[in-house]
Amino acid sequence: DHEFDAVVVGAGGAGLRAAFGLSEAGFNTACGTKLFPTRSHTVAAQGGINAALGNMEEDNWRWHFYDTVKGSDWLGDQDAIHYMTEQAPASVVELENYGMPFSTTEDGKIYQRAFGGQSLKFGKGGQAHRSCCVADRTGHSLLHTLYGRSLRYDTSYFVENFALDLLMENGECRGVIALCIEDGSIHRIRAKNTVIATGGYGRTYFSCTSAHTSTGDGTAMVTRAGLPCQDLEFIQFHPTGIYGAGCLITEGCRGEGGILINSQGERFMERYAPVAKDLASRDVVSRSMTLEIREGRSWGPEKDHVYLQLHHLPPEQLATRLPGISETAMIFAGVDVTKEPIPVLPTVHYNMGGIPTNYKGQVLKHVNGQDQVVPGLYACGEAACASVHGAIRLGANSLLDLVVFGRACALSIAESCSPGDKVPPIKANAGEESVMNLDKLRFADGSIRTSELRLSMQKSMQSHAAVFRVGSVLQEGCEKISQLYGELKHLKTFDRGMVWNTDLVETLELQNLMLCALQTIYGAEARKESRGAHAREDYKVRVDEYDYYXA
């Protein structure tokens, strides 16, 4: 048993920012993470972080606000978006003060590149250059900068501790219970405030850009605690994942001048989006690519991908602005970008939905049609859904989301509590269900391997709830996923030990993934409209009445 003023679950960009924000304010803070902090998935973000700094041309946060609301397909929470875009320039300056090595222009300002869906003057002033970047490794720099910063403070890190469940009492959150992967010990971390920053659940799909650790642990913990999730059916497909490997090729490539071509050598985006062309918003590009592939204007023996061409760009531009991409393409596709195009395919990239919060990061539940704050529980980052992204996220808004809302969680805890406040007691047997579940899985002796069941789930999500969705296929998907969820009882685990039992951890992650997959596909089936990333072929129109009541 441990006792803290606050505990943060997850140590990616949002988790670290929340944790050292709390420590800075004098709170005795714990940060539990199943990975070493710099292994978190934030490290894989490539493109950049949006802020209306106006280094490349005149810019205004209100224009960024407009683009984000429009980009969310009018589902985003405008208070939260207002807060995020207004805070953006200060957040980027703060990062630079922490020592983040941004790419710069010749006169020493932060370099900003063009990204999809970004405009000037409320959509009337043409393409905006708003995405501050560190070549094509922005997330890597961000995470290492934040981690370096967090070491100045006295935060207690529980590294390689897998959070099992929230400790809830009388509708309040009193902390978390976690498994230490290193020695198999169980830790109850009691705290007055708990922040969930566990990232997304991209691994519910077969082809995705997320790390194998993006298993929606926080989302599932909240579900098990009987709290609602929001907008899980909105899943962003990134237009350019490497064919076969799923590795991400940043939108920055198209921001620097790369183009998509079909098997006739035609730059097909000119047909679908005459103005923005290859920098249209991500759902538009993904759907256009899918249509080209369906209609047979695609490459490969199975005619199932298109090409991203960069070799018309000068080699020195590729070397300075996109060094990591040249390397990634070589390793995962065997392609030399200066001579040949990269095979790409739309790939699951980001979860817009998650744990519902307000712009202060407080988790909400829905009681009699009203939002109600869950005492002691906060969420930020990809796990949360303050809904700054609505139905589809704009590129380079996610790193901004991490830093702004990680900080917001720390600030709102500091507003409502002070360091050293008494931690409310918990029942002596709190968390015993989690331990029972753990033991049950450790000795599980059924007929299906974890990996087999996981693969069936990923394949069925990929085929039933992809870029285009139809009612009949979604219903079939709901039945299939429900059936697979039932098969969790028949799992077989092989490692009975307690030390570094990865078999057990993967099985726990599968339980979490299943809960996310179930809610996602049922949500998609129930949302009878097309909006943002959720494109229904049988309901092609957006239903604006949905904006006003919970579907």
From Swiss-Prot:
Its main location: mitochondrion. The modification N6-acetyllysine is found at K109, K121, K124, K192, K277, K365, K422, K427, K440, K459, K480, K489, K492, K540. GO terms for cellular component: mitochondrial inner membrane. Acetylated. Deacetylated by SIRT3. Phosphorylation at Tyr-157 is important for efficient electron transfer in complex II and the prevention of ROS generation. Enol-oxaloacetate inhibits the succinate dehydrogenase activity. GO terms for biological process: mitochondrial electron transport, succinate to ubiquinone; tricarboxylic acid cycle. GO terms for molecular function: electron transfer activity; flavin adenine dinucleotide binding; succinate dehydrogenase (quinone) activity. The active site is at R282 (proton acceptor). It comes from the Eukaryota. It is found in: Mitochondrion inner membrane. The keyword Membrane applies. InterPro entries: FAD-dep_OxRdtase_2_FAD-bd (IPR003953), FAD/NAD-bd_sf (IPR036188), FRD_SDH_FAD_BS (IPR003952), Fum_R/Succ_DH_flav-like_C_sf (IPR037099), Fum_Rdtase/Succ_DH_flav-like_C (IPR015939), SdhA/FrdA/AprA (IPR030664), Succ_DH/fumarate_Rdtase_cat_sf (IPR027477), Succ_DH_flav_su_fwd (IPR011281). It catalyses: a ubiquinone + succinate = a ubiquinol + fumarate; (R)-malate + a quinone = enol-oxaloacetate + a quinol; (S)-malate + a quinone = enol-oxaloacetate + a quinol. Keywords: Acetylation, Electron transport, FAD, Flavoprotein, Membrane, Mitochondrion, Mitochondrion inner membrane, Oxidoreductase, Phosphoprotein, Transport, Tricarboxylic acid cycle, Tumor suppressor. It is a peripheral membrane protein. SUPFAM superfamilies: FAD/NAD(P)-binding domain, Succinate dehydrogenase/fumarate reductase flavoprotein C-terminal domain, Succinate dehydrogenase/fumarate reductase flavoprotein, catalytic domain. FAD binds at A11, A14, T33, K34, S40, T42, G47, A163, D217, E382, S398, L399. Pathway: Carbohydrate metabolism; tricarboxylic acid cycle; fumarate from succinate (eukaryal route): step 1/1. It is an enzyme of class 1 (oxidoreductase). Flavoprotein (FP) subunit of succinate dehydrogenase (SDH) that is involved in complex II of the mitochondrial electron transport chain and is responsible for transferring electrons from succinate to ubiquinone (coenzyme Q). SDH also oxidizes malate to the non-canonical enol form of oxaloacetate, enol-oxaloacetate. Enol-oxaloacetate, which is a potent inhibitor of the succinate dehydrogenase activity, is further isomerized into keto-oxaloacetate. Can act as a tumor suppressor. Component of complex II composed of four subunits: the flavoprotein (FP) SDHA, iron-sulfur protein (IP) SDHB, and a cytochrome b560 composed of SDHC and SDHD. Interacts with SDHAF2/SDH5; interaction is required for FAD attachment. Interacts with TRAP1. Interacts with LACC1. Belongs to the FAD-dependent oxidoreductase 2 family. FRD/SDH subfamily. This is Succinate dehydrogenase [ubiquinone] flavoprotein subunit, mitochondrial. The lineage of its organism: Eukaryota, Metazoa, Chordata, Craniata, Vertebrata.
